[in-house]
């Protein structure tokens, strides 16, 4: 097996193993995303005269709701993976091996970002109502950190040898170990590193959103909510294209790797979110136009 020919290859999913405690890359990257997100969001909140403490206040519920939503969404469409003989899995707790329901083992991978976005939005909506905060302004503050977190978190797929694309021999090909390949592609060694594509795309969106965020201070046409709508458009556009390369899609009415006879859920949701973003920008621009018309009239 000529694994050295691969441009990239995962070193494994474990960052540190202390025997009684194992730290995995996936969890480490999520933690890093949260810390960076707190720093950026608090800085953006100050620029909008929003109390930065609100970022810390919403954090626990935002994290919990996002993780639950992401996991719940994934498990629904992959229930066969967690049912029957696979219902329980082993968990090392301070050097004691116990059995827990496998759908709780989120550190082993298996989350869907669209589910996380739904859970996170519900948390933000409830928080803004309880604190009487302008929802669109608060969303615009949080969105740049969210897309950056998505960019960083995608590398968890790399360490877990998951969420890769169709076979390829391109120079940046990714080697996938035999045990991580779907049976349909067991004889292929190298695959599209779709996590890199999405990570880079999301980072570019982050740069774009940050630059527009600060332009809102001087451009009245960029109303609150514009950042959020642009995020829906940009992220969904990239995700739709990248999802078409993946061989592990969540399917509705079909089976992986290509959801024959069915739909790729991520692509369907991307179309919905993309359209929602366009409609949102249309109404924001219409509101700006009407405001200028009344002012000039």
UniProtKB/Swiss-Prot annotation:
The lineage of its organism: Bacteria, Bacillati, Cyanobacteriota, Cyanophyceae, Synechococcales. InterPro entries: Lgt. One of its GO terms (molecular function) is phosphatidylglycerol-prolipoprotein diacylglyceryl transferase activity. It comes from Prochlorococcus marinus (strain MIT 9515). The gene is lgt. Belongs to the Lgt family. It comes from the Bacteria. HAMAP family: Lgt. This is Phosphatidylglycerol--prolipoprotein diacylglyceryl transferase. Its EC number is 2.5.1.145. It is a multi-pass membrane protein. Its main location: membrane. Catalyzes the transfer of the diacylglyceryl group from phosphatidylglycerol to the sulfhydryl group of the N-terminal cysteine of a prolipoprotein, the first step in the formation of mature lipoproteins.
């Amino acid at each position: 097996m000529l694994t050295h020919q691969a441009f990239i290859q995962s070193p494994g999913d474990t960052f540190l193993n202390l025997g009684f405690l194992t730290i995995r890359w996936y969890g480490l990257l999520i933690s890093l995303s949260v810390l960076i997100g707190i720093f950026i969001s608090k800085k953006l909140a100050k620029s909008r005269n929003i109390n930065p403490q609100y970022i810390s206040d919403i954090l626990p519920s935002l994290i919990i709701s996002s993780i639950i939503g992401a996991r719940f969404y994934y498990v629904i469409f992959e229930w066969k993976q967690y049912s029957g003989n696979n219902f329980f899995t082993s968990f090392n707790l301070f050097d004691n091996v116990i059995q827990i329901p496998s759908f709780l083992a989120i550190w082993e991978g298996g989350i869907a970002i669209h589910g996380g976005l739904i859970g996170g939005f519900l948390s933000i909506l409830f928080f803004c109502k309880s604190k009487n905060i302008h929802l669109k302004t608060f969303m615009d503050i949080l969105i740049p950190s969210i897309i950056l977190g998505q960019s960083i978190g995608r590398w968890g797929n790399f360490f877990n040898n998951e969420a890769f694309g169709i076979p390829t021999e391109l120079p940046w090909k990714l080697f996938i170990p035999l045990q991580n390949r779907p049976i349909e592609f067991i004889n292929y060694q190298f695959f599209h590193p779709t996590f890199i594509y999405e990570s880079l795309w999301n980072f570019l969106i982050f740069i774009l959103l940050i630059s527009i965020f600060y332009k809102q201070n001087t451009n009245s046409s960029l109303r609150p909510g514009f950042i959020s709508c642009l995020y829906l458009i940009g992220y969904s556009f990239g995700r739709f294209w990248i999802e078409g390369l993946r061989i592990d899609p969540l399917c509705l009415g079909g089976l992986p790797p290509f959801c024959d006879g069915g739909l790729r859920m991520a692509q369907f949701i991307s179309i919905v979110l993309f359209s929602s973003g366009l409609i949102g920008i249309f109404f924001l621009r219409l509101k700006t136009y009407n405001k200028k018309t009344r002012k000039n009239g």
